[in-house]
């Protein structure tokens, strides 16, 4: 029986960046890893309704920088930045070093695998039919410009006695092509019948140029300078 490798793990360093980017010696590594885990756990619990896509952690010179990618930045920031300041203080306490929190807005949540998976799970928990939720997610992604998408839901679908998986795919999702930009993520729906697992693969196109091209695309675009017109004398 063919098993699939994790689409993000196999592309790390090729077209996918790491979620934690720091270096540490042998003594500090375990502590840093543990505090990363606790910071992520705290932020996911605290910002459960803020549509969090991913949390990137950097550690420059005895401090911690956390970048939260979210579709709803207003909820994270709060009124006059009160909420984000509270998050910063708690993250600094957990990590034991000064903290900085940056917010990055996800422009197209329909093309983000984590947000799509969370959207499907919230619909399943509200007792919406799983086929309708899957089809809606696929149609929205294709409408926003995805080259392909696959959605799989597994568990006691519709309250059935025997658990089974069902999937729906549109377009192409090339899992073996390493330069393919495939966003993959999972989520869980807790229903009265038990837990339903949701997996989402979104193919956004091929990245030519490797990590250099990815890093260039993630940088904010520089605004072109306005040229001053020389007046006629």
From Swiss-Prot:
Gene3D superfamilies: 3.30.300.20, Ribosomal protein S3, C-terminal domain. GO terms for cellular component: cytosolic small ribosomal subunit. It holds the Pfam family KH_2. GO terms for biological process: translation. GO terms for molecular function: mRNA binding; rRNA binding; structural constituent of ribosome. Keywords: Ribonucleoprotein, Ribosomal protein, RNA-binding, rRNA-binding. Residues 39-107 form the KH type-2 domain. Part of the 30S ribosomal subunit. Forms a tight complex with proteins S10 and S14. Binds the lower part of the 30S subunit head. Binds mRNA in the 70S ribosome, positioning it for translation. Belongs to the universal ribosomal protein uS3 family. This is Small ribosomal subunit protein uS3.
């Amino acid at each position: 029986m063919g098993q699939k490798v994790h689409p993000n793990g196999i592309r790390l360093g090729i077209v996918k960046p790491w979620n934690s980017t720091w270096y540490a010696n042998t003594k500090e590594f375990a502590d840093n890893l543990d505090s990363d885990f606790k910071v992520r756990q705290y932020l996911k619990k605290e910002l459960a309704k803020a549509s969090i896509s991913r949390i990137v952690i950097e550690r420059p010179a005895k401090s911690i920088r956390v970048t939260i990618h979210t579709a709803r930045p207003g909820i994270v920031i709060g009124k006059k930045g009160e909420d984000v300041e509270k998050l910063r203080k708690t993250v600094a306490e957990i990590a034991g070093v000064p903290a900085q929190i940056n917010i990055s807005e996800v422009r197209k949540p329909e093309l983000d695998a984590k947000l799509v998976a969370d959207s499907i799970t919230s619909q399943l928990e509200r007792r919406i039919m799983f086929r309708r939720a899957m089809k809606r997610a696929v149609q929205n992604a294709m409408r926003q410009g995805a080259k392909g998408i696959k959605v799989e839901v597994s568990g006691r679908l519709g309250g059935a006695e025997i658990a089974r998986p069902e999937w729906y795919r549109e377009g192409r999702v090339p899992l073996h092509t390493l330069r393919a930009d495939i966003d993959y993520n999972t989520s869980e729906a807790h229903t009265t019948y038990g837990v339903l697992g949701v997996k989402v693969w979104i193919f956004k196109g091929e990245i030519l140029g490797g990590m250099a091209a990815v890093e260039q695309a993630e940088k904010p675009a520089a605004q072109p300078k306005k040229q001053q017109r020389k007046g006629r004398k």
